[in-house]
Amino acid sequence: MSKIIGIDLGTSNSAAAVLIGGRPTIIPSAEGTSLGGKAFPSYVAFTKDGQVLVGEPARRQAITNPEGTITGIKRKMGTDYKVKVFGKEYTPEEISAHILRKIKQDAEAFLGEKVEKAVITVPAYFNDNQRQATKDAGTIAGLDVVRIINEPTAAALAYGLDKGGEQKIMVFDLGGGTLDVTIMEMGEGVFEVKSTSGDTQLGGRDMDERLLDYIVEKFRQETGINLRNDVMAMQRLREAAEVAKIELSSMLQTTINLPYITADASGPKHLNMTITRAKLEELIQDVLERCRGPMEQALSDAKLSKSDIDKIILVGGPTRMPAVQEFVKRVMGKDVERGVDPMECVAMGAAIQAGVLAGEVKDILLLDVTPLSLGVETLGGIMTRLIERNTTIPTRKSQIFTTAADNQTSVEIHVLQGERPLAKDNISLGRFTLVGIPPAPRGIPQIEVTFDIDANGILHVSAKDLATKKEQRITITAPHRLSKEEIEQKVKEAERYAQEDARRREEIETRNQADNLIYTTEKMLKEAGDVATSEQRERIEKAISELRDALSGKDVQEIKSKMEKLQNAVYELSAAMYQRAAQSQSGSATGSASGSTSGGKTVEADYEVVNDDKR
């Protein structure tokens, strides 16, 4: 059975892990470590010559190719948003699939075997649409997503693997684009989520934007130039702001130095600005304060007080910032745990859950919850809840509804997710119609609506007329979710990208081999001297010229053909040079043999017989 990997598909950084010898191990990125350590940046870039770059290579070229570079796409998952690059539109699922495909390739290179299955983490506060979109992205990338689990839950798995005894923990997960606060109880191998709260539009990127706004405004005051009108300057500045934020986690001040950031009539302008940790902390105060509500909500939903919490685990890159750690400590009144890497623990926890599903890990039971209430729209535009938020999943709940008008022969089921009393204020997950209800006065027919949430947190709904036993079932899909046909089309497109990548790699390797062949052949011609006949030289030089002409074109097969022609031309000269060298060595050896006597007398040597049996 092939390995199931665990994937942390993040807004700013992504990582993956796998169980090796029962322990979660981070899968190294092909490019090595980056700003995120073993995690790699969640960047995807399309170049004008048709290449697709993912991770660190995409981030490095973002300054020179801002219009072709995409980052932070996770915030758009589960929406109808499309990003347009060089005239072509891409869905968030397609962009995320490129990141997942890179992870798949890195994992296969690391493990030396095919990887086809994965557990992918999502923010606990992701709704049904966002979870479905994540599964679709995995499918496009060629992965069977065997489970979707919540990021804080995964972090707790990584933290609690070696911990004994019962304890209540708070997982404060502040990532690049989302905040999740989860209260869990752990003990005897059982990880039970008691409540979860959060904000899917709050994270480290908001901190970057605060710093960015400050720098842009200060530069405008000093020079009169608004850098927001310059796309390339903003890309340079955005990257510098992120680096400065990271550096200020371990330093009291840092300098942003960007020469030639822009120019006006008076000439080029340079940006050189010192940022202190105190200034950054001042700028992000409003972001930190937005974290307070979800923390208090999670405690309230779990019916616990701050003093009931035994441990606080911090997850996500921004939690490395002293200001974030101090804020959580101030709100909760206790220190935070230091024994877990905030950038790696989610992927490691996903790998542990993968191990549970594969049967590699025993005695662990994960009880997660649904983050938002689920219900249907009823008469008057009211949302009637069937499943309350923070209900342990998987779960199933049924409720009887009836008709609102006389002789009504069909009912539309409008499925909703959220906490607002009016249907229009909640997230619409989908609609379907149950038909064939016998005409009857209103209030007489009995329609049983059943909500069934699976272990991935994905909803299945059915409606059944109890009189006729007619039933309609659907797996909820958002109106803008990709259809099965669209997903299959995206899978084929992804395969074409993989084929194109392989073709480009073959072309690069062939060109390198051709360049090397030309170099070694020209070196051989110089060393050959009079061994090479004029005819041989002419034939080889002509073959070199033809190969150079082929290299100036784009036909790989033509390059290979001309390489073969040059190799054949070189073969005859190589044989002649080898023969000359052999003759030279033979002559030298003969000279040595004739000098093995001393004064015309044979030199005798002592010898000892060795017994073959004891040798």
UniProtKB/Swiss-Prot annotation:
Bias type Low complexity, positions: 581-600
InterPro entries referenced in this protein's UniProt entry, alphabetically: ATPase_NBD, Chaperone_DnaK, Heat_shock_70_CS, HSP70_C_sf, HSP70_peptide-bd_sf, Hsp_70_fam
Family: Belongs to the heat shock protein 70 family.
Keywords of the record: ATP-binding, Chaperone, Nucleotide-binding
Organism: Methanothrix thermoacetophila (strain DSM 6194 / JCM 14653 / NBRC 101360 / PT) (Methanosaeta thermophila)
Classification via Gene3D superfamilies: 1.20.1270.10, 3.30.420.40, Actin, Chain A, domain 4, Substrate Binding Domain Of DNAk, Chain A, domain 1
Pfam family, one: HSP70
Keyword Chaperone: yes
Keyword Nucleotide-binding annotated: yes
Protein name: Chaperone protein DnaK
Region: Disordered, residue numbers: 579-615
HAMAP family (UniProt xref): DnaK (MF_00332)
